[in-house]
């Protein structure tokens, strides 16, 4: 099944492709987050009809956008960009101050406590990326500019599965980097 011919309306096709990517290995990838995660972002964006999908890493009190996919004309964040953790929704999801699935951000009872954004956020879904050692790497997030009442708990489960894929890929890359550094250290 190729990326171009995938029927995004079919939940089964989406889940099958994510499962394929979960078991795939990235031989020799030199980026911390390998290309299969970018493909997953595109799948999520199209399948859930979101405007923006990204993987963020939490670094020194900041949220760094490591991979980003957007619909045409929706490039409101960029790979490599960052902001304070308190300026976004990610940290709030991780620590439980905000639900993982929000159909309409404007309708949240605690909307006044949320940080202002430079662009509208209607529907929002986010889940932590938890590494094998238990540390939270960051989050796997997506949002649309408009509210979306059609999102379901099953959609959130799909996002959680994608976060597991990202965690697996990050863990594998870190293990390769550690192995390489250890080999270099022994050679010196």
How would you describe each model-predicted region?
Residues 2, 8, 17-35, 186-188:
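Short regulatory/linker helices and ligand/cofactor-binding micro-motifs at input modules
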Residues 29-68, 77:
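Helix-loop-beta substructure at the N-terminus of cytosolic sensory domains
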Residues 113-137:
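Helix-to-coil/beta transition segments that act as allosteric "coupling" elements at the rims
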Residues 172-188:
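Signal-transducing coiled-coil/dimerization helices and immediately adjacent hinge/linker segments
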């Amino acid at each position: 099944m190729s990326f171009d011919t995938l029927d995004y309306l079919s939940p089964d096709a989406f889940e099958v492709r994510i499962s394929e990517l979960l078991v795939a290995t990235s031989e020799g990838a030199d980026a911390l987050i390998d290309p299969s995660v970018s493909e997953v972002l595109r799948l999520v964006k199209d399948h859930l009809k979101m405007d923006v999908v990204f993987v963020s890493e939490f670094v020194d009190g900041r949220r760094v956008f490591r991979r980003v996919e957007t619909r045409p004309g929706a490039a409101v964040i960029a790979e490599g960009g960052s902001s304070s953790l308190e300026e976004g929704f990610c940290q709030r999801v991780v620590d439980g101050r905000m639900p993982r699935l929000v159909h309409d951000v404007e309708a949240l009872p605690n909307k006044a406590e949320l940080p202002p954004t430079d662009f509208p956020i209607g529907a929002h879904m986010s889940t932590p990326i938890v590494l094998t050692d238990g540390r939270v790497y960051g989050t796997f997030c997506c949002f649309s500019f408009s509210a979306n009442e059609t999102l379901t708990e099953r959609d959130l489960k799909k996002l959680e599965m994608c976060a597991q894929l990202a965690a697996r890929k990050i863990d594998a890359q870190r293990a390769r980097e550690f192995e390489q550094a250890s080999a270099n250290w022994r050679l010196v």
